[in-house]
């Protein structure tokens, strides 16, 4: 298992996203511009570190000379999420499901195994795979994947305008609403539910 720093993971994710969207890797200058580096040389140093760790392969003499070894196709299936690390960090990915990202709309960036029956009344059951579009831009009523104090949960999002409190509603009367005070809770929206896959 490759251990990457947060910055290295960010660059690797950028390379993967760029290849998925355009079919080819970004240049050093593009990486520097997107991530706010002062020069392409700074991006080059990070790329060399990634290559030393085996996360990428570099092809000399080509401006887009970056290759991902053993590129996996399909949507990553995320397992247990470690505290303080990005949800799509390599160590969280258990497998890849052979489904095109654009099978869902908006596209699914990852799959998450549902644990529990708190959302059963809208057909999200224990053991299902939830297709998730990675974004923190959600609206009232959306089904979201949220992280609270490093626990990941699937709930319906509600927030009143100008209030520092978020409510995460279950779709099962046996479960309680989770209230989160944004001023003191370690809270983040990890993504928006875009579909469910039932395991047979």
Curated annotation (Swiss-Prot):
Annotated site residues (Cleavage) in this chain: 83-84
Q: What is its EC number?
A: 3.4.21.88
**Reactions catalysed:** Hydrolysis of Ala-|-Gly bond in repressor LexA
Coiled-coil annotation reads none
Q: Which key words tag this protein in UniProt?
A: Autocatalytic cleavage, DNA damage, DNA repair, DNA replication, DNA-binding, Hydrolase, Repressor, SOS response, Transcription, Transcription regulation
Regions recorded as binding DNA = 28-48
Q: Which CDD domains match?
A: S24_LexA-like
**Active-site residues, Swiss-Prot/TrEMBL:** 118, 155
GO molecular function: any one? DNA binding
Gene3D superfamilies named among the record's database cross-references: Umud Fragment, subunit A (2.10.109.10), Winged helix-like DNA-binding domain superfamily/Winged helix DNA-binding domain (1.10.10.10)
How does this polypeptide assemble, per the annotation? Homodimer.
Q: Per its record, how is this protein called by name?
A: LexA repressor
Q: Which organism is it from?
A: Teredinibacter turnerae (strain ATCC 39867 / T7901)
Identify the coding gene: lexA
């Amino acid at each position: 298992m490759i251990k990457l720093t947060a910055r290295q993971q960010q660059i690797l994710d950028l390379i993967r996203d760029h290849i998925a969207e355009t079919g080819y890797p970004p240049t050093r200058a593009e990486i520097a511009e997107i991530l706010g580096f002062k020069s392409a040389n700074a991006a080059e140093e990070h790329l060399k570190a990634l290559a030393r760790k085996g996360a990428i392969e570099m092809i000399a003499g080509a401006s887009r000379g970056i290759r991902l070894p053993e590129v996996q196709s399909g949507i990553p299936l995320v397992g247990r999420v470690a505290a303080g690390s990005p949800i799509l960090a390599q160590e969280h990915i258990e497998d890849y499901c052979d489904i095109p990202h654009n099978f869902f709309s908006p596209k699914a960036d990852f799959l998450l195994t549902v644990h529990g029956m708190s959302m059963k009344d809208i057909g999200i059951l224990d053991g299902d795979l939830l297709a998730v579009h990675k974004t923190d831009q959600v609206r009232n009523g959306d089904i979201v994947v949220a992280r609270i104090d490093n626990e990941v949960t699937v709930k319906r999002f509600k927030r009143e305008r100008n209030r520092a409190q978020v409510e995460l509603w279950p779709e099962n009367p046996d479960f309680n609403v989770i209230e989160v005070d944004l001023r003191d809770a370690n809270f983040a929206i990890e993504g928006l539910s875009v579909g469910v896959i039932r395991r047979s």
